[in-house]
Amino acid sequence: MGKKRSREEAQKEVVQNDPTVDKMDEDSDSSDSDEDMDIINVDFELFNYDKDIDFHGVKTLLRQLFDADAQLFDLSGLSDMIIEQNTIGSTCKVDDKANDAYAFLTVLNAWEHREKKPVAQLIEYLSDKAVKAGDSSLSVLPELFTSGKAQVGIVLSERLINMPAEVIPPMWNMMIEEIQDAVDDKEPYEFTHYLVVSRAYVEVESSLDQEEQKRKRLRDEKGLQYFHPEDEEMRKHAVGAGTYTFTKEGDSADSKRAFQELGVKSQGFMMLIEAGRFKQAVKAIGDCIGAAN
């Protein structure tokens, strides 16, 4: 393996969000409390993974990414693997490297790590879900995973739900550069395909209403929505994409009822992108998010 690259202080990517955080006046007795607010500018910085700092932050975000099925994976082992390849992908933090990650992005070589438990679990799980995802183009995934001729990069990315989308293009652009540097160093990152693992959701009638509407058994599912706006753009460049039901799915819609009139049914979501179209997909993310702001 070639010499690992590192991003030092001068190379850190700084993402300025101007502004992102609203600090509301906490005096609920004041008639003006709902209108008064202070604007806080927040700088987000990208860092290499650090084994002494990032384990718990990455593991927490992985648990969020895999949702109800997080219990099916060795998340500790997967977190260790992500952190060990510390020059591929980034964490996004506020203020200081020592803080927990607000977001992370990485890619794992499925073939290279196929015999390691965390990746073996991922391959088995994603192969099964790909067949059930409702897109015939994803049915090739099990074969791609088991063929040494195909090199599938499993892309894992997650962030706190209130993170601004502006942090995403720099993370993806930096990873593209790092992958190319790794390939130049003869490291195993020359992929034929990228499998982006994410989440989506649909709005559904909460089962809390069932007592009042016993005769109405069908749930009213609205259109598919994306937790990550970049997924909608990236999907346009995928050869296959689809959602899947979590194996350990619970009634997650009811747990979120307090925040909106309808429940939220979270689903797994995956996109298979050929390597030749991946850079174009990443560029489209930047174009889309930039145009929206």
Curated annotation (Swiss-Prot):
<comment type="function">
    <text>Involved in nuclear export, actin cytoskeleton organization and vesicular transport.</text>
</comment>
<comment type="similarity">
    <text>Belongs to the BCP1 family.</text>
</comment>
<dbReference type="GO" id="GO:0015031">
    <property type="term" value="P:protein transport"/>
</dbReference>
<feature type="compositionally biased region" description="Acidic residues">
    <location>
        <begin position="24"/>
        <end position="35"/>
    </location>
</feature>
<dbReference type="Pfam" id="PF13862">
    <property type="entry name" value="BCCIP"/>
</dbReference>
<dbReference type="GO" id="GO:0005737">
    <property type="term" value="C:cytoplasm"/>
</dbReference>
<feature type="compositionally biased region" description="Basic and acidic residues">
    <location>
        <begin position="1"/>
        <end position="12"/>
    </location>
</feature>
<keyword id="KW-0963">Cytoplasm</keyword>
<dbReference type="InterPro" id="IPR025602">
    <property type="entry name" value="BCP1_family"/>
</dbReference>
<feature type="region of interest" description="Disordered">
    <location>
        <begin position="1"/>
        <end position="35"/>
    </location>
</feature>
<protein>
    <recommendedName>
        <fullName>Protein bcp-1</fullName>
    </recommendedName>
</protein>
<keyword id="KW-0813">Transport</keyword>
<keyword id="KW-0653">Protein transport</keyword>
<dbReference type="GO" id="GO:0005634">
    <property type="term" value="C:nucleus"/>
</dbReference>
<keyword id="KW-0539">Nucleus</keyword>
